[in-house]
Amino acid sequence: MKSFLQPLLSRSLLIGLFVFALASTASAADETFNWAPSLNVGDALPAISAVDQDGNEHSLAQLSGENGLILIMSRSFDWCPFCIRQLQQLVESEAQFNAIGFNVATMTYDSVATLKEAEEEYETTFPLLHDEDSAHIKAMGILNMQYEPGNRAYGIPYPGIFVLDNNGVIRAKLAEEDYRMRPDFSLVLEAAQAVE
């Protein structure tokens, strides 16, 4: 009797573990990454007042094109290779956004001097905004909490992209949970084209 029950119990245990694993996988798949969770599509982006790489101050309205603005929130153009690669891709993609009435801008905690160096090195023609004390990053709820004050990375955001209409209303948010990955600009362009 004992030898008959043993394989049955083993099979039951394996089936139970398999069902548990499937349930766990389904539950994990249901949890989607929500970048900037305090800001939803349809919300107005908090007011922006920031200086660019030339020391010129910009508001959200001044940054916007006829149809809107693509605002890229980046970690650093000084030491983050993923941000630098994204910046280079943005330089290549800017004309496509301009053609549909969208301006582009980036925002980081980098100093104005660092942003000026980035402009010269990567030949940008759009505003690279300095977020003083990461005030906007904090207001948007995207401050990377992994770093403590005093760490050189303190003040960086979780990177992502806002597609804003010409009234500063969020029409799309694009981000990857892994900071090393960035949304493809073809997807950003599609989101911008959908703005009426």
Predicted regions and their residues:
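Bacterial N-terminal signal peptides that target proteins for export
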Residues: 2-14
